[in-house]
Curated annotation (Swiss-Prot):
Keywords: Acetylation, Citrullination, Cytoplasm, Isopeptide bond, Methylation, Phosphoprotein, Ribonucleoprotein, Ribosomal protein, Ubl conjugation. The gene is RPL4. It is found in: Cytoplasm. Coiled coil: none annotated. Component of the large ribosomal subunit. The ribosome is a large ribonucleoprotein complex responsible for the synthesis of proteins in the cell. It comes from Bos taurus (Bovine). This is Large ribosomal subunit protein uL4.
Length: 422
């Protein structure tokens, strides 16, 4: 399949090249912006909505009044009267059976959206540019494997077709009938409540036929399922990008294809059929980044690449790792050895001094036969008891004063002795 050529072949009604060529319009090289297409499609689709609302009286067509507090029931308004189950039931509230909904819908909602004209034209240009790329068209599910060329252009004789069988034969000759068979196979019943709202059956989209003049082409193609017919002067983004997704399979008539440059212009010339409109330009004129980066102008400003690879090595502490310290300071090994020898020499000197001092002390006391014990205290003799030191501020237990002698108490004379004495 040929695509994006500067010259596009025009095919006859027999499905063969007629020998005529058409220059590819500049609009097919416009930037493809799916975000703009989706935004415009979403807003324009809202303009087809029909206002709806619930009745203003719904849920309030009863007499109800709150019972107030003190009855151990909710303070919601309750239906008055008696003699029926309805009396005493809650009313009016959105939480009540038979009550109104929360925030009842109104017909004065902002249903429609205004979209900038230039933005709508940008979206159409993007949709047309995407329709010329086989990858995008096939990603939408269109069966174009056997189509000879994209964009597909046919002679203007097709605009004079009045019979559906002529249109079917043309699609079969152009190898586009596989896309119609896909539509037939996709016809099914809608899931959900749309079945009750005149949207019972659904199907996939087929080719979009774009013409310049209607000489009967609408009647010829309109009864084929999936077909959409558009006038080139009234292109619709809702038809060119159904669902807001670019990549619709389009079949053009020759006169409609030639008119695109007049409608949308080129980058050298403004559009003649639209006032003061210029074709949108790419933000990046050359998308070949490797070619741009390797160009001599950019390479001249860049520094030479660093080809040496510096791998990150685990950093070790030289104060704990002798091997790393020796790499930094080879004299560290000699220093460490000298330190060890100096410590050993100092230790030996201290031990000799301690032994000499102990021996001199034992000689002064006249203790014979005892060898000086180096580094340990003398052991106590077995059986020697440690004398207790006198406690300061308290009298010792052995130095108690003897108790004073008590005088003999004189016996008092009894009453009988007193009588006898008298």
């Amino acid at each position: 399949m040929a695509c994006a050529r500067p010259l596009i072949s025009v095919y006859s009604e027999k499905g063969e090249s007629s020998g005529k060529n058409v220059t590819l319009p500049a609009v097919f090289k416009a930037p493809i912006r799916p975000d703009i297409v989706n935004f415009v499609h979403t807003n324009l689709r809202k303009n087809n909505r029909q206002p709806y609302a619930v009745s203003e009286l719904a849920g309030h067509q009863t007499s109800a009044e709150s019972w107030g507090t003190g009855r151990a029931v909710a303070r919601i308004p309750r239906v008055r009267g008696g003699g029926t189950h309805r009396s005493g039931q809650g009313a009016f509230g959105n939480m009540c059976r038979g009550g109104r909904m929360f925030a009842p819908t109104k017909t004065w909602r902002r249903w429609h959206r205004r979209v900038n004209t230039t933005q709508k034209r940008y979206a159409i240009c993007s949709a047309l540019a995407a329709s010329a790329l086989p990858a995008l068209v096939m990603s939408k599910g269109h069966r174009i494997e056997e189509v000879p060329e994209l964009p597909l252009v046919v002679e203007d004789k097709v605009e004079g077709y009045k019979k559906t069988k002529e249109a079917v034969l043309l699609l079969k000759k152009l190898k586009a009938w596989n896309d119609i068979k896909k539509v037939y196979a996709s016809q099914r019943m809608r899931a959900g409540k749309g079945k009750m709202r005149n949207r019972r059956r659904i199907q996939r989209r087929g080719p979009c036929i774009i013409y310049n003049e209607d000489n009967g082409i609408i009647k010829a193609f309109r009864n084929i399922p999936g077909i959409t017919l558009l006038n080139v002067s009234k292109l619709n983004i809702l038809k060119l990008a159904p669902g807001g997704h670019v990549g619709r399979f389009c079949i053009w008539t020759e006169s409609a294809f030639r008119k695109l440059d007049e409608l949308y212009g080129t980058w050298r010339k403004a559009a003649s059929l639209k006032s003061n409109y210029n074709l949108p330009m790419h933000k990046m004129l050359n998308t070949d980044l490797s070619r741009i980066l390797k160009s001599p102008e950019i390479q001249r400003a860049l520094r030479a690449p660093r080809k040496k690879i510096h791998r990150r090595v685990l950093k070790k502490n030289p104060l704990k790792n002798l091997r790393i310290m020796l790499k930094l300071n080879p004299y560290a090994k000699t220093m460490r050895r000298n330190t060890i020898l100096r410590q050993a020499r100092n230790h030996k000197i201290r031990m000799d001094k301690a032994a000499a001092a102990l021996e001199a002390k034992s000689d002064q006391k006249g203790v014979q036969g005892k060898k000086p014990v180096v580094g340990n205290k003398e052991k106590k003799a077995v059986g020697d008891k440690k004398l207790k030191k006198p406690v300061v501020g308290k009298k010792a237990a052995g130095t108690k004063k003897p108790a004073a002698e008590k005088k003999p108490t004189e016996k008092k004379p009894t009453s009988e002795e007193k009588k006898a004495a008298a």
